[in-house]
Amino acid sequence: MKMRIQIFFILSLFSSISFASVQDFCVADPKGPQNPSGYSCKNPDQVTENDFAFSGLGKAGNTSNVIKAAVTPAFAPAFAGLNGLDVSLARLDLAGGGVIPLHTHPGASEVLVVIQGTICAGFISSANKVYLKTLSRGDSMVFPQGLLHFQLNSGKGPALAFVAFGSSSPGLQILPFALFANDLPSELVEATTFLSDEEVKKLKGVLGGTN
């Protein structure tokens, strides 16, 4: 019986290892099927050095929008070589007063490093405890997987930061957009958020929601 348990444990351990760790890499094939562990692998004969490089983070994003912020992601499959390696990154540009609203990454934890400006960042634990920190150039902060967190430009000029994730596809859900940028009926939003009808319709108008 003890031997069976040991064998089961070993098999479970090996089954949890990503496909990319069995081979050298698993470059994403965007034309193939996607599963919870990532994209299917590109034919190794078709893989080139370009699959392992990404040049999209050197240019500032467009912050002319309602949140005065831009996120430039380097995720799979756009950065195909990341597939299966449990790592990715993104660039954050925040104009004056810009904010990345409360959001979560269901698939990964996040580490942020400030390159320029001052950013007020924080997250809320599952016990509803708030962890808040004002970050300056060179400062870093970690945001645990799945917890609500935000970044706000609290300085006088623009702010720039880079973030890294523990997944090639960390996922993203922005709370205000999830509530007010879709067709969820206003009466349900009001009932579940304790906001008035006027407040809900105002936010839906700003973020493009209906009903």
Curated annotation (Swiss-Prot):
Keywords attached to this Swiss-Prot or TrEMBL record, sorted alphabetically, are:
Apoplast, Cell wall, Disulfide bond, Glycoprotein, Manganese, Metal-binding, Secreted, Signal
The residue ranges of the Cupin type-1 domain are 55-201
Residues at which Mn(2+) binds: 103, 105, 110, 149
Query: What main location does UniProt list?
Result: secreted
Q: Name one Pfam family in it.
A: Cupin_1
Localization per record: Secreted, Extracellular space, Apoplast; Secreted, Cell wall
GO cellular component terms listed in the entry, alphabetical order: apoplast
Q: In which tissues is it expressed?
A: Epidermis and spongy parenchyma of young leaves and epidermis and cortex of stems and petioles.
Taxonomic superkingdom: Eukaryota
The UniProt similarity line reads:
Belongs to the germin family.
The job of this chain, per UniProt, is described as: May be involved in the maturation of walls of growing cells.
Assembly notes: Oligomer (believed to be a pentamer but probably hexamer).
Which positions, given as ranges, span the membrane? none
The record's annotation in PANTHER family points to: GERMIN-LIKE PROTEIN SUBFAMILY 3 MEMBER 3
Q: Which InterPro entries match?
A: Cupin_1, Germin, Germin_Mn-BS, RmlC-like_jellyroll, RmlC_Cupin_sf
**Glycan-bearing residues:** 62
Q: List the disulfide bonds.
A: 26-41
Name of the protein: Germin-like protein 1
Q: What are the boundaries of the signal sequence? A: 1-20
Task: Extract the GO molecular function terms from the UniProt entry.
Answer: manganese ion binding
